Amino acid sequence: MRLTLLLEMAAKLKLPHDYRFGMSRPSTLAAKRRNPPGKRRSKVFVEPVSKEEWQYFRGDTVEVLHGKDAGKQGKVTQVVRARNWVVVDGLNTHFRYVGRTDEYRGTYVASEGPLLLNQVSLIDPTDRKPTEIEWRYTEEGERVRVSARSGRIIPKPVLQRRDGIIPEQWKDGPKDTSVEDALERTYVPSLKTFQEEIMEKTGIAENRRHRKSYWY
């Protein structure tokens, strides 16, 4: 585990109760522009889905059930649990201009729009067709997703962080800080100033005597 991951775990972003989640992460500039301080936005009602019953994860292969791309399959690239959204790579796309100004018309790019959970379905590995799933436990006690039609286990995709690192496959390099080194207590409290500590470490002896000072 890297030191940056430990710092991310320690930092918790506090959001107002009426915050409206979108495609951008709350800490990004785009999300802050859509949720400026003091602005109240209408509430968006979302069907609650518990963490234990959530079925879709980044890297899953799903099939679109409704819309212009119905019947097409793709890989989930983003999950927004606060809105019951999933984003599928290359599907449900719309085109827009990015970076438009008065002097420049901008760049015309394709952007994937979000899909609700009831608009997609997981793929059965047996026949590559959409299927409902159930959460069950294996003999080893592992909780897995099982196809309701064929009984085949649908494995969860390997977790990949936003920086492209897969924790299970990561190997610390010479420049990575280990967990033991990050958690080791090396600071020793002292009443000495920083300059006095440096002098003690380098063996500098102070022979000068402080002059008397007078206050009037």
Swiss-Prot record:
Keyword Oxidoreductase: no
Tissues where the protein occurs: Ubiquitous. Expressed at greater levels in the kidney, adipose tissue, muscle and liver than the brain, heart, ovary and lung.
Keywords: Mitochondrion, Ribonucleoprotein, Ribosomal protein, Transit peptide
Pfam family, one: ribosomal_L24
Localization in the cell: Mitochondrion
Residue span of the annotated presequence: 1-9
Cysteine disulfide partners in this protein: none
Residue ranges occupied by any KOW domain in the UniProt entry: 56-89
InterPro entries named among the record's database cross-references: KOW, Rib_uL2_dom2, Ribosomal_uL24, Ribosomal_uL24_CS, Ribosomal_uL24_KOW, Translation_prot_SH3-like_sf
GO cellular component: mitochondrial large ribosomal subunit; mitochondrion
GO biological process terms held by the UniProt record: translation
Main location: mitochondrion
GO MF annotations, alphabetized: RNA binding; structural constituent of ribosome
Family that this chain belongs to: Belongs to the universal ribosomal protein uL24 family.
Subunit description: Component of the mitochondrial ribosome large subunit (39S) which comprises a 16S rRNA and about 50 distinct proteins.
Name of this chain's protein: Large ribosomal subunit protein uL24m
Classification of source organism: Eukaryota, Metazoa, Chordata, Craniata, Vertebrata
Gene encoding the protein: mrpl24
